[in-house]
């Protein structure tokens, strides 16, 4: 049997990404994907506005910064409202993780991503994303198919907005750069890689550092029982 680097993308979960989202509804839109992925066979497809109205919370077109606990509580309310079975909680939160045992953390994350009855949301930079897969590759081109080589790990994220981490003022400066410095296509490529793709990746090392250094950032788990 041929063994190569471990790579996986949950295409079924990606099908439920609620895109586009309302301007400031990343928390609710990410949860919409989770609800539909886990329970659409029981309750049908729900839009963000539909489930928000049915649990009597605020509309997604209203600007609100709900926080992690609120997102978890919304899920519990949806489960109760539709008489479903499920649970949720923090999957990775810095103070609860043995970061010295990185292989165990990675193994646990992979198992969760591959589990049909579970889905994960990553809270980063005041933004929420679906974790839809992972990708491993060697650090040396001669080891491209050597599964014992030292690895670079990426986490595949499902994006429901045009979230762009580049500040607006910097975006404007980039687009004003003359073509002798950066072509129009290069500027568009930079903006698109930074902002709008429905699927993108972030290095596991960067996510790990983010979760360690930023107290409010975390990975949340939502599971169907």
Give the positions of each predicted feature.
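Conserved active-site-adjacent core of cysteine acyl-enzyme catalytic domains
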Residues: 53-161
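Short, charged low-complexity linear segments at domain edges
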Residues: 1-2, 222
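Noncatalytic regulatory segments and standalone regulatory/sensor domains
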Residues: 134-225
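Polar/charged alpha-helical tracts
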Residues: 15, 50-53, 80, 107, ...
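Intrinsically disordered, low-complexity regions enriched in proline, serine, glycine
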Residues: 35, 43-47, 87-88, 131-133, ...
